[in-house]
Amino acid sequence: MSAKSKKNTPKKKHAEDREPGFHNAPVPVILFVIAILLAYWGMNYLNTNAGGFNRYVYGPYNSYEVVADVQPGSGDDPIKRGADIYRNVCLPCHQASGMGAPGQFPPLAGSDWVNTDGPNRILRIVLNGLNGPMEVNGQSWNAAMPPLGDVIASDADLAAVVSYIRNTWGNEASICTPEEAAAVRAESGDRGRSWSAAELLALPVEVQ
Amino acid sequence: MNQGPTLFLGVLCAMAVSWIGFVMLPQVQLGSQSTRVVKELGRHYPSPRGGLAERGKDVYRAAGCASCHTQQIRQTGFEFDMVLNDAGDFTNSVIALVQQANRSLSEQEATDLVAKAPITIREGVKKEMADHILKLFKDSGAKVAANIRPLGPDIERGWGPRQTVGLDYLYDQPLLLGNQRIGPDLANVGSRLTDREWHLLHLYHPHTVVAGSIMPAYPYLFETQEIDGEPSPDALPLEGEFAPAEGMEVVPKPEANSLVDYLLSLRIDNPVFEAPYLFTQAESSEDNNSETEQAQ
Amino acid sequence: MDANQSSKSPSDWSDIDRSYRFPTLFLASKAVTWLLLGSIFSLIASIKMHSPTFLASCSWVTYGTMVPAALNAVVYGFALQAGFAALLWMTMRMGQVKLVAPGYLYIGATLWNIGVLVGIVGIMAGHSTGMAYLEMPGYALPMLFAAYTLIGGIALVTFHKRQVRDLYPSQWFIFAALFWFPWIFSAASCLLVGSPVRGVTQVVIDGWYASGLNVVVLGFIGIALLQYLIPKLAKRDLYNGYLSMFAFWVLLIFGSFAGILPGQTLPSWVGALSTVCSVFVAFAWIVLAYNIYRTIEGGGAKSDALGIKFLYLSLASGLAAALLTAWASRETIAEVVQFTLFLPGLKWLQLYGFVGAGLLAAIYLFLPKVSGTQWSSPGRWTATFWTYAVGVLLVAVAFLFGGWKHGKGLTNPDMPFMDIVRGGIAPFIRMSTVGELLVTIAALLLVWNVSCLFWRTYSGCLLNCCGLAGQGGDSGKSQSKKGSK
């Protein structure tokens, strides 16, 4: 090996200002072994420390689930918590009475979209927004609702506000659990565009 | 690799990978963030700085304060304090459960604690233990909460109640987060050092308020002028070697005032989703009104 | 398959080298001037750290303006400019082709210097952008980009017109650096300064730009120099081209991700990805160093004792910087060294120790060949080397150890901050000031050396122009220059 790396002396001695050449000796196998081991280590490291490449996972928390789980007040009454969120996020458009505004924002009180057996469609509307014509209680509406998935970032909060909507102003539908909210968020949270009424009606009301 | 085109294609692919990894992906994730409603504050967070503070940020940038000061609080861990909020009806079994949760308590101590609910029954537990204790109390009729407490040298040093996250800097342009701590961290300095005069003196000459400081002086932010009849109300109370000559006073220029406004606007004093902690009523003096409204 | 270049005898180089004379001397002399200015700014900043009232009354020389001014002067004024000069020379030599359109190169170089000057003055005037490595205000950046299109364009055309089609490993590195720089520079300028992205995305893109600049652009120029000059001086061939290829691809793909330590205000995936890539970069560096070690193993004296010293300093610093970055990226270590003097220490090793020493070696070795004049005082060059080496190592070691102590103090919440700064890091800062003084002296000697060479090369011409010809020695010198090798 070392004999090969010594300079090949051509007929004359290498001149002072000679341009270097290079050999293409066979690469030692150990290089590939180490490279593969490093790649394996790298994958493992990213698995444990990268927080699932999630934008909400910082510092000592390992995953989105952990962050969502440790939120203070997670044990509170969800309806009360939902009321707080409704007041801050939804009330400006849908009003404190849940009646909305004619021609602009559909009502939530007594709405056939809200009083379904499961919260699947409502969760998706809150997460991604809604655009285009829809029929609520027989009336036609054509409005745009912005996506709120980022504004209501935690699944517990999302479940709370949906539970509140489904149990106030005379609505008597089921509570939405944080697990259901998490499941729907996982499926459609990154959708990036609003739903249309037709797309939603094609989906089941129960969360899968 | 003797072909120029092969090399070029390879370099192009590497550029694409690099771009996607650290330019496109962060832009998709972080660049599209918007303000968020924070329940504890009852409003959107963060709110934009006032006009004078924005100009102060410009002074901060131009003077290069970010070369010595960071605005980033780090967090290295978290633990929980278990709080008994409501003992419920079955106090005897709850007392026993409290003793199980905190084995260092005698029966008398546990009884006292239960009587004084809401009260902390155990401090500083890790997540597994916190989950275990919550499960203990699940069907007992008592209400127990696990309150998260962030840990870290920055937090214990009093630089802030939680780590800083991307949401805190949404309105900052340019970001002046800094990466050297030759001076203390400033992310929460507006909550920590609230005295305007202290800041002005510190900027004029740090030795007036901090002996032995290595921070340079910034006298060019101030004006040394003749006392015109009555001393100006803005004049700095300088003494000893820092006092100006007889009959002169030092007043801050608009740059100094706006810089201090900016520093006083630097606050990290509410939890956010990514960095939770228990927010107590006392921390939000300005938002007390919205807090009482929620009680309805 | 052995790929030995044909051994051209020295007299054949003269026409190739000569085509490049004026632009090289121009680039090199401007570069060393910027190094001097940068080290003066750095020295002022360092003095301010223990003498806060030093030059306090002027807003143009605050600590916060001197530090970015020094960094930008050294990166854009010295390192990139000397880097362009070095890579053009290597491209011509390895491709055995004359420089294409040297006149445009001169225009490009002038524009570059004007851009850097405007940028530095802008930083001092308070218009810094606040972005690390890109503090020059927005109005200076287009000038730099325009200058680069000329310089980079000429380099690429020269590369394309090469006579020897086989590529030596250094040429891959040069090619990659030439493409990488305008890409990251324009992207960073647009996304950070032109139309800034929102929030902490700026931190990630800034880190991406800084890593790309350090590891890929400047790092590749430095590596190209090491792989070209060390075998050249040792009169050997590079041990294994495949090892170079491996290192090339690893550094190219992963290099721009390295260097963002975990613990900043960013989601954890950014720091974690950066850590993994820093380790890959360190591994690639080990492979490179091994390759060079095998190249010179068992060899005799090198054809230039001082040149090889610069190159060994460069290699050792580059390897140390890569290994230390990987070590510091681990979460437990990053907790200690993040936000401390450790990071400027790494920067000194990388920028001054590795890239700087490599470029100084290049200047030392190729300016005489290009200009046709020898250095007038080898003793001054020895002094330059020793003051530079000792100065850089003093600063780097002071910052690295001081940074560790700094970090340990920061992680101890019971230790008051003033104690950390006063007792902990003050002695290290004093040590670094001494080091920076030595580097400034080295830069001064360097400027003296290069100016002497410049004068001796062109004094005949200049004096002819001014009608002062016919003064014995001078015209005699210019006569002998034309015939010399």
How would you label these PLM feature ranges?
Chain C
Residues 1-485:
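Hydrophobic alpha-helical transmembrane segments of multi-pass integral membrane proteins
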